[in-house]
Amino acid sequence: AAERYESNHAGIYEMCKKDYPEILEELEKEPFQDLLDAGCGPAPMISLLSEKYPERHYTGLDLTPAMIAQAQKKNIPNATFVVGDCENFPFESNCFDAIICSMSFHHYPSPQAFFNSVKRCLRPNGRLILRDVTSENKVLVWLMNTLEMPLANLFGHGDVRVPTRELISECCEKSGLKLEKFEIRKGMR
């Protein structure tokens, strides 16, 4: 998967690329100096950000060593890449102004642990930009969580669950984060 991620035959990974302009637009609303990309894969978003803002520092975190190896091959001078768990960030407290997580949250078995790590590692007034698959249609979410996610796991995709607005809101509240905006765009996005 790591080698395929940024190819023209990436399949599901193509969905991630559609998020980049909106993530960039959201990041540009407030200044940041240190950014974490949680579930960074081979770091396509960090590559784009580093070109646009070379004076800032970026950290990529991914559980998969092959993804981090691909990211490191890019030799991004203002970036650090770490193999680690997005449910238990291996970083000191208050070390990031912004954390982005694009299309990896549905892989996390313990969503609350992720939000707790975000809260611990964000500086005061820092922000999380989370993009993932979801829907307001409870039947569709049930079908995906009952059928599609388990089938995807049979093929090694590591999917766990489609998060809902309720799950995100509850996790934010329990971790002490303030949910400022929750949008569902174009069907499952």
Task: Identify the residue ranges that each predicted region occupies.
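A conserved beta-strand element that flanks and buttresses the S-adenosyl-L-methionine
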Residues: I100
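Conserved class I S-adenosyl-L-methionine
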Residues: A1-E30, P44-L48, M67-Q70, I129-A152
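Short catalytic micro-motifs in class I SAM-dependent methyltransferases
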Residues: M103-S104
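Class I SAM-dependent methyltransferase SAM/SAH-binding core
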Residues: L36-A38, P42-N88
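A short glycine-rich, Lys/Arg-flanked "PGG" loop and its adjoining helix->strand segment in the class I
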Residues: Q112-P124
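Conserved catalytic loop of SAM-dependent methyltransferase domains
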Residues: E180-R189
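Short alpha-helix
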Residues: V160-S175
